[in-house]
């Protein structure tokens, strides 16, 4: 049995490869925040009405051009734990809503960036989490207080959802069909 250099007991057992670097404390936080910011930067250029397409080279050698955040994230090969969390976040957003992946990732990236700044200034992580929870609660309350019934805007909502989905030639017809079927479904459900 190996003893520690001071003879007080067993020496620590090394469980990592000698070439593996081990980071702890603020170093881990900085790496996680840096990875979150980098992940957001991958999608930043595709965001908004002036967003640009990205050319992706897939592992099978094919190239794809898209500005769809979900498609871009699905093609990324990530190993970093923070990047894996962002891939999971993107998948959850896509599964729940079918859209909004880029916005979701950019928001999460900015929240992580701000969290990094606050942690560097000495804010305790539990206080940071509590603050984010309070901000979420206030945001949801504010959204509820400002929300209005859709009324006659449903057709415009359908048009907006269909834009960019290779439906431009039949946009008027499809948006009216969406309105008709959603109205029928609402009537059927009571």
What are these model-derived regions, one by one?
Residues 1-183:
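N-terminal glycine-/lysine-enriched basic segments
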Residues 184-190:
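A short, hydrophobic C-terminal helix/tail in secreted or cell-surface proteins
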């Amino acid at each position: 049995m190996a003893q520690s250099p001071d003879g007080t007991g067993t020496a620590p057992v090394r469980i990592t490869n000698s070439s593996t670097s081990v980071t702890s404390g603020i170093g881990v936080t900085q790496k996680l925040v840096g990875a979150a910011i980098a992940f957001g930067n991958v999608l930043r250029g595709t965001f908004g009405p002036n967003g640009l397409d990205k050319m992706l080279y897939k592992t099978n050698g094919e190239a794809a051009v898209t500005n769809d955040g979900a498609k871009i994230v699905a093609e990324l090969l990530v190993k970093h734990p923070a990047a894996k969390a962002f891939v999971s976040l993107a998948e959850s957003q896509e599964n729940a809503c079918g859209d909004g992946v880029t916005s979701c990732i950019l928001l999460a990236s900015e929240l992580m960036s701000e969290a990094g700044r606050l942690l560097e200034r000495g804010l305790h992580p539990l206080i940071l989490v509590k603050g984010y929870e309070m901000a979420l609660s206030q945001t949801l309350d504010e959204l509820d207080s400002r929300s209005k019934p859709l009324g006659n805007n449903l057709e415009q909502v359908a048009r907006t959802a269909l834009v960019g989905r290779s439906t431009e030639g039949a946009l008027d017809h499809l948006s009216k069909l969406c309105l008709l079927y959603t109205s029928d479904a609402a009537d059927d459900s009571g």
